[in-house]
A protein has these predicted regions:
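Carbohydrate-associated surface elements
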Residues: 91, 108-120, 208
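Conserved donor-binding/catalytic core segment of Leloir-type glycosyltransferases
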Residues: 130-148, 155, 167
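Nucleotide-sugar-dependent
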Residues: 146, 199-204, 211-233, 241-251
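Nucleotide-activated donor-binding/catalytic signature segment of Leloir-type glycosyltransferases, i.e.
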Residues: 170, 178-202
Length: 303
């Protein structure tokens, strides 16, 4: 519905009323207006904030069902008025810094709730749904939408390696309702478990043999930094991921593939290893926790 101008205007009016109510209720005289939504410049300014912050986490103009041109125009207007801009990928940084200026734009990748996902290293019981699924297990957690997940790759690997079992956790069609999964459902080694509570994810990931980020190459994925990358890393499970731009700096910490055949070779390589470079993973994760990242962001805001 957000593609319709009337809906966008109505959303802004409603949100403005809610925010002004809470601003008065909590007596917020000099709030910092921090948004992930590029369509709310006037709303931010109505709060009379001490600083305006835009946190760019995805190329939203490349999302299905979005009025790309309207979003790009609104984002450009917003970027020119921001005091600080944070970006979660280098492609987003390059885009935003051209409009907002490099002195205002800062690159910080996505992060992990380490305390939560590191629970996978503890003695958690195996979920009942997994007990009858053979090993090796290739796991994925996230939105099961075709612009985010390469379903053709998953089907190909399932057919070529019938002894490998895919475990897919997430809502089908999130952000893309037309997504279909009939071809996946008919394969005995692809297990669609549906969405799970956030609190239970470590319990499932603990029993994966390989964590996968099998995204397609497109305008959306070219600018995303997968939240699940550091979440998987915090569990100390090996990761194989598509060679998207945002992960180019961390290829030493996971297996990166470009072709479908590389994926199969990568999984075989991972499964043949008895140990992995846990120390490198631990160092990377420590640099990319919510606590570490917020401290760095607050320093930027205070400067």
């Amino acid at each position: 519905l957000h593609r319709y101008k009337f809906v966008r205007i109505l959303n802004k009016v409603l949100l403005k009323g809610i925010l002004l109510f809470y601003k008065r209720k909590f007596k917020l005289n000099d709030p910092i207006a921090w948004t992930y939504n590029p369509m709310v410049l006037e709303l931010m300014e109505s709060l009379s904030p001490s600083k305006k912050v835009y946190h760019s986490v995805d190329d939203l103009s490349a999302s299905p069902g979005i009025d790309s041109q309207a979003l790009k125009e609104e984002e450009a207007r917003l970027l020119k008025k921001m005091d600080v801009v944070f970006c979660t990928s280098k492609n987003l940084y390059n885009h935003c810094s051209k409009i907002a200026g490099k002195e205002k734009t800062h690159y910080f990748s996505n992060v992990v709730d380490y305390e939560h996902f590191s629970k996978a290293k503890t003695d958690l019981a195996q979920p009942k749904e997994l007990k009858n699924i053979p090993h090796p297990r290739l796991g994925f957690v996230g939105a099961l939408s075709s612009y985010k997940v390469d379903f053709d790759l998953i089907k190909q690997v399932a057919d070529e390696r019938p002894d490998w079992h895919w475990i897919l956790i997430g809502k089908v069609g999130e952000g893309q309702p037309e997504t279909t999964i009939e071809d996946l459902q008919h394969r005995p080694n692809i297990h669609l478990l549906g969405p799970k509570d956030y609190k239970d994810l470590p319990q499932y990931i603990k029993y994966f043999d390989v964590c996968t980020i099998p995204c397609p190459k497109n305008d959306y994925t070219d600018s995303m930094f997968p939240m699940k990358f550091y979440e998987f890393m915090a569990t100390e499970k090996p990761i194989i991921a598509k060679n998207i731009d945002s992960l180019s700096d961390v290829t030493h910490a996971h297996f990166s593939y470009s072709k479908d055949s590389d994926f199969i070779e990568g999984v075989e390589s991972i499964l043949s290893k008895k140990s992995h470079d846990i120390i490198v993973w631990q160092e990377l994760v420590k640099e990319n926790t919510w606590e570490t990242r917020l401290n760095k962001m607050f320093k930027v805001l205070q400067s």
